[in-house]
């Protein structure tokens, strides 16, 4: 079954909160932020929250674009490519000072966190979730 809009939103929220949260806990101490560990954790989790909130908004745009496709879904690889426009928007918002609580973030730290988190979440969504949560796929990507 093709994921529904609400299924995509639920999947994004669950995977970013759980998988992205765990990955952020692991990777933050190794990021070249130049800040204290507490400040680094605050920044990385605020960036993750920004990605989640903007990602939910992106889903509405993606849903509208998918209506022009016969199968009403992206090919799997397109889901990976959306990393580019979403990452660029988050980076521009951070640089513009539009993300509350996030100061100056080095580009290298942002790229390491964003790209690796995106890849981990994408791999989990296209691997273990589809294997271990078979009902998730039959329910249009919804968890509840």
Residue ranges and their predicted role:
Residues 1-144:
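Aromatic-rich, lipid-facing transmembrane alpha helices and their immediate juxtamembrane interface loops
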């Amino acid at each position: 079954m093709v994921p529904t809009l609400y299924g995509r939103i639920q999947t994004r929220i669950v995977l970013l909160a759980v998988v992205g949260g765990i990955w952020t806990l692991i990777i933050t101490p190794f990021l070249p932020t130049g800040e204290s560990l507490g400040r680094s954790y605050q920044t990385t989790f605020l960036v993750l929250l920004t990605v989640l909130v903007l990602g939910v908004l992106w889903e509405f745009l993606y849903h509208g674009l998918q209506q022009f496709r016969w199968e009403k879904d992206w090919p799997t690889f397109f889901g990976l490519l959306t990393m580019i426009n979403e990452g660029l928007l988050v980076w521009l918002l951070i640089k513009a000072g539009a993300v509350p609580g996030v100061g100056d973030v080095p580009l290298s730290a942002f790229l390491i966190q964003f790209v690796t988190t995106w890849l981990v979440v994408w791999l989990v969504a296209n691997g273990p979730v589809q294997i271990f949560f078979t009902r998730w796929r039959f329910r249009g990507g919804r968890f509840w």
